[in-house]
Amino acid sequence: MYVVRDIFTAKPGMASKLMKEVMTMPNSPRARILTDLVGDYNTVVMESEYKDLASYEKMMQEYTSQPPELRQKMAGYTDLWQSGRREVLRVVD
């Protein structure tokens, strides 16, 4: 199993709005949304689990082939954050 974390640092005052946008992203039904309690301020994390890397790759292909109207709806969310990164972690049993 793999855990994928998309970690965003929101612009000041935009963390709650970014969190709402991330919660409505398509193809992320299993995602958990996390926010900072201590540590770096304005952090929003979308954490998802995948059985294998092929499942993750399939989700990414679906995500990148969204219809134009959905892409347009999501275009503004990049204005809400100043940096981001992705972590792909293997779960060790």
Give names to the regions the model predicted.
Residues 1-70, 76-93:
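Short S/T/G/P-rich N-terminal loop/turn motif that feeds into the first structured element of a domain
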